Amino acid sequence: MQVLNTMVNKHFLSLSVLIVLLGLSSNLTAGQVLFQGFNWESWKENGGWYNFLMGKVDDIAAAGITHVWLPPPSHSVGEQGYMPGRLYDLDASKYGNEAQLKSLIEAFHGKGVQVIADIVINHRTAEHKDGRGIYCLFEGGTPDSRLDWGPHMICRDDPYGDGTGNPDTGADFAAAPDIDHLNKRVQRELIGWLDWLKMDIGFDAWRLDFAKGYSADMAKIYIDATEPSFAVAEIWTSMANGGDGKPNYDQNAHRQELVNWVDRVGGANSNATAFDFTTKGILNVAVEGELWRLRGEDGKAPGMIGWWPAKATTFVDNHDTGSTQHLWPFPSDKVMQGYAYILTHPGNPCIFYDHFFDWGLKEEIERLVSIRNRQGIHPASELRIMEADSDLYLAEIDGKVITKIGPRYDVEHLIPEGFQVVAHGDGYAIWEKI
């Protein structure tokens, strides 16, 4: 990411905020460190989540975070925001109102932190029934007709809403009507809404929810038109498992899907990345006595970071896999081993709110982020895997940092001269070159 270009594009920022951003440029050149600023239950917070998170801005910024990911901002049938209806209506969000959201974004900007909006545009819930009694009439949340759609904006092969639009370009979302992204009016009005979120509300970047629900070609249209400073797509597909229920050693097909998506959206010329679900799935199992999984057949990392690290956004858990949903949780007693991996390795690491604030891991995570920033580890850093056995994973990053994961202690003979331990915890240790 080029910080100066980002700041030029953000012409709505005040001069004082630009000065703060310039002061943090040394951190930003090391690459993004993302922070998911909510969980599945955040909407329940008394007084509103936006107001609550305002009290965490200083801690998040001080930790070296460059981007904070906020929940879907619009009116939604589902409290968490993932069943959106009136897209322009930010006052109906369970997280707070539009004014509170703008104040929160301004507070993050004042600390040099960019803000990612959770963009849910694969599907949408209707506001009214038509004359046949079918819910297929949508309201945009403005006095005019923007985003006021009918059944012709719904994919005709979708089971909801009796749609008459084009066929779906991606996977079906079972809980709500899938939007016809081939429709030019849909494209035009969604781009207008995204531009409004960026220019009027203050968002800098996008997280694309359920991005497998529409083609990468459609995602490219929205990203190219709105020019976010950063974008990350959720493309969560099933891994290939063996008879024991564990992931197969070879997950090339799984990570190829992620690489293909990024390539179609624009590749190296785009700010788009994808969540590295391949690394997530392998790491989940590897820390349970199978650390050999962390070296692929080619000697490189087995996830997306082994093929295209600059375009991989790594994570340990999120509001779906962890939190109260617990759909694919990381082993709870080994979470810091997961962070030791993603925060010292190539890729764009994302820290989960729960682990940082609720699990008592704040200081340990901060220490790892500090090492990453101090040593200039970036999304495309060079990774050399030194050992990968059942009880030991040892890797050198950029010739400056060595990461050890696993219970084995007798590793000093494997550490080159000129390195010293700078962080350690249950099942992990980090060395820096002196």
Swiss-Prot record:
Posttranslational mods: Only cereal amylase known to be glycosylated.
GO biological process: starch catabolic process; sucrose catabolic process
Cofactor binding note from Swiss-Prot or TrEMBL: Binds 3 Ca(2+) ions per subunit.
Tissues expressing this chain: More abundant in germinating seeds, than in callus, young roots and leaves.
Binding site residues for Ca(2+) 3: D158, D172, F173, A176, D178
Binding site for substrate: 75-77, 82-83, 207-212, 236, 238, 256, 263, 300, 306-308, 319, 325, 404, 409-411, 421-427, 431
InterPro entries in the cross-refs: A-amylase_bs_C, A-amylase_pln, Alpha_amylase, Glyco_hydro_13_cat_dom, Glyco_hydro_b, Glycoside_hydrolase_SF
Sites annotated Transition state stabilizer: D320
Cofactor(s) for this UniProt protein: Ca(2+)
Single Gene Ontology MF annotation: calcium ion binding
Residues reported in the UniProt entry to bind Ca(2+) 2: E139, T142, D144, D148
Signal peptide from the UniProt entry: 1-31
Residues bearing attached sugar chains per UniProt: N271
Active site: D209 (nucleophile), E234 (proton donor)
First-tier enzyme category under EC: hydrolase
EC number: 3.2.1.1
Keywords: Calcium, Carbohydrate metabolism, Glycoprotein, Glycosidase, Hydrolase, Metal-binding, Signal
Record's subunit section: Monomer.
Alphabetical list of PANTHER family matching this protein: ALPHA-AMYLASE (PTHR43447)
Its job: Important for breakdown of endosperm starch during germination.
Descriptive protein name: Alpha-amylase
Species the sequence originates in: Oryza sativa subsp. japonica
